């Protein structure tokens, strides 16, 4: 379910302020954020934002195709390492 159109997209105020300040100064540095729920705005294109995945910050370079999506979509929180392998040791225990 999406957000109501009358409310508009959400972006963390501090994160958006940092982006706007960096655009005015012409700086490009990594910004750490825990706000996975923030929507990517056109002002963010070209910046690298490190999004927290619950364990570490995953650096994400923002491109035009990402505008309108959430930051959390690009930093997965779960890592699937595969099911157990069928080895001699595991079958011998039965």
From Swiss-Prot:
PROSITE patterns linked to this entry: RIBOSOMAL_S19 (PS00323)
Domain of life the protein comes from: Bacteria
Keywords: Ribonucleoprotein, Ribosomal protein, RNA-binding, rRNA-binding
Entry keyword annotation includes Ribosomal protein: yes
Gene Ontology MF annotations: rRNA binding; structural constituent of ribosome
Pfam families assigned: Ribosomal_S19
Matching InterPro entries: Ribosomal_uS19, Ribosomal_uS19_bac-type, Ribosomal_uS19_CS, Ribosomal_uS19_SF
UniProt keyword annotation of RNA-binding present: yes
Any one GO cellular component localisation term in the record: cytoplasm
GO biological process terms on file: ribosomal small subunit assembly; translation
Family membership: Belongs to the universal ribosomal protein uS19 family.
Database matches in PANTHER family: RIBOSOMAL PROTEIN S19P FAMILY MEMBER (PTHR11880), SMALL RIBOSOMAL SUBUNIT PROTEIN US19M (PTHR11880:SF8)
Role played: Protein S19 forms a complex with S13 that binds strongly to the 16S ribosomal RNA.
Protein name, as recorded: Small ribosomal subunit protein uS19
Gene name, Swiss-Prot/TrEMBL: rpsS
